[in-house]
């Protein structure tokens, strides 16, 4: 996974050369070198609200539209949700996964007009599979730093244009031999978790069965398997031991967009805003001596920073819903531990006992998650947007009753890039 263009936590709030229509000089442009990482107190930042959310209906192939048409569809829906027009947007931040997924290099060169960015700042973010989350955080930091007041952020993937399996089967010296796709890379880490935690081999099937049932309640989800059963999941072919076919994410075409704005913009919004209480990014190398692929340190650090910003001391009790990046079903229990919802070796017990069900104590992926919808570049932003929908009370049939705080989570590369935000139904205090 290429880290080129990855936006560091210290750099996300400082868009080089991006001049706001309100003017970059003075206090609106004074982001400070540490503004993006949440190192400053909330009192020094502008509160950020999500006031518009739009998605395409995700499918295996959108042959009816170009990439430009796909992204404009999501952007238009986000603007309509916010009841804003293109002229209300000060800047555009877009993201997608590696270009070989479509075979179109630097597609952002062709998207300024489709996204209403002509004459305005537009930038692209790239942090592999976590890019959808990172892109939203860069946009959020532009508002928090008072560089821009209202920002359109969007992430997308049109995987039908190329072959993701081929693209992810990298040759030596970039990857070990005999790997096929992302599953070939992650399967040994799943096996290591099972051995370390003493988890029964049925847990992955439970996650897949749950998420596919949740997806039936989400009209935007790619996979709508009305005949899904636990037995069907368990009988599906083994692709990368211990990962079965039905425990694997699909390849999707789709886009997701959000409109982020400041306190004044939120006050004018016809929709209930989702307020950003904390957001962070962390990274680490793909390979290094002592790396823990089962529970990467970067993921732990990223979650800890978000919780600190949001004043969360007990995530298991204080967070009402989690949209977690789970491309292979076993990553639900693994990330439950990595994010502090369960002690080491205990995550699978939450899954097995039904805690993560839609009606459980800690619903995980009520939307159906990445296991049901996976336009890779947009998958992380969908997690963030779905978390925002939960606290707005607008998630439809997959709404978690009484959700007040929700976590959006994304990871990418060789479990090396992490991005997360926590949103709430009320403005942050302080």
Question: Each predicted region: which residue ranges?
Answer:
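Long, intrinsically disordered low-complexity tandem-repeat segments
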Residues: 2-39
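Condensing-enzyme catalytic core mediating Claisen C-C bond formation in acyl metabolism
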Residues: 35-68, 205-207, 238-305, 353-367, ...
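Conserved active-site "lid/cap" helical segment
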Residues: 38-130, 138, 193-200, 222-223, ...
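Conserved catalytic cysteine-centered active-site region
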Residues: 42-46, 59, 96-154, 158-185, ...
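Beta-strand segments within the central parallel beta-sheet cores of soluble alpha/beta enzyme folds
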Residues: 86-96, 121-127, 151-155, 202-209, ...
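Short glycine/threonine-rich loop-to-helix capping motif typified by GTGT followed
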Residues: 99-107, 288-292, 325-349, 360, ...
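Active-site-proximal alpha-helical scaffold in enzymes
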Residues: 126-157, 183-217, 258-264, 374-395
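Acyl-CoA/ACP chain-elongation machinery
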Residues: 155-156, 161-163, 167, 208, ...
């Amino acid at each position: 996974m290429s880290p080129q263009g990855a936006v560091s936590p210290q750099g996300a709030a400082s868009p080089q050369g991006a001049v706001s229509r309100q003017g970059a000089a003075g206090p609106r442009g004074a982001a400070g070198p540490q503004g993006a990482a949440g190192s400053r107190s909330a009192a020094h930042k502008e509160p950020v609200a999500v006031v518009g959310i739009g998605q395409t209906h995700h499918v295996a192939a959108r042959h009816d539209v170009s990439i430009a048409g796909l992204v404009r569809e999501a952007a238009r829906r986000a603007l309509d949700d916010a009841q804003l027009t293109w002229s209300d947007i000060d800047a555009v931040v877009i993201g997608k996964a590696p270009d070989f997924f479509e075979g179109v290099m630097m597609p952002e060169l062709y998207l300024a007009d489709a996204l209403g960015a002509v004459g305005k700042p537009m930038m692209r973010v790239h942090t592999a599979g976590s890019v959808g989350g990172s892109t939203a955080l860069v946009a959020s930091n532009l508002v928090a730093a008072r560089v821009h007041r209202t920002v359109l952020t969007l992430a997308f993937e049109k995987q039908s244009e190329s072959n993701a399996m081929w693209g992810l089967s990298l040759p030596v010296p970039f990857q070990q031999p005999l790997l096929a796709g992302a599953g070939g890379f992650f399967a040994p880490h799943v096996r290591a978790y099972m051995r370390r935690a003493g988890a029964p081999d049925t847990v992955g099937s439970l996650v897949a069965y749950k998420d596919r049932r949740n997806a039936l309640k989400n009209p935007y989800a790619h996979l709508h398997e009305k005949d899904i059963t636990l037995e069907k999941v368990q009988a599906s072919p083994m692709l990368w031991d211990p990962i079965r076919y039905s425990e694997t994410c699909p390849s999707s075409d789709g886009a997701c967009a959000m409109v982020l704005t400041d306190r004044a913009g939120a006050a004018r919004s016809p929709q209930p805003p989702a307020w950003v209480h904390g957001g962070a990014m962390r990274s680490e190398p793909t390979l290094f001596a002592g790396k823990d692929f089962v529970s990467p340190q970067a993921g732990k650090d990223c979650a800890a920073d978000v919780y600190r910003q949001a004043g969360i001391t007990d995530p298991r009790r204080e967070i009402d819903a989690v949209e977690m990046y789970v491309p292979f079903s076993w990553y639900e229990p693994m990330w439950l531990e990595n994010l502090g919802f369960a002690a080491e070796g205990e995550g699978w017990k939450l899954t097995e006992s039904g805690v993560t069900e839609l009606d459980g104590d800690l619903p995980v992926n009520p939307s159906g998650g990445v296991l049901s919808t996976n336009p890779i570049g947009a998958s992380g932003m969908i997690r963030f947007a779905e978390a925002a929908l939960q606290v707005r009370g607008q998630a439809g049939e997959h709404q978690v009753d009484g959700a007040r705080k929700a976590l959006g989570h994304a990871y990418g590369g060789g479990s090396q890039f992490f991005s997360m935000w926590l949103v709430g139904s009320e403005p942050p205090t302080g």
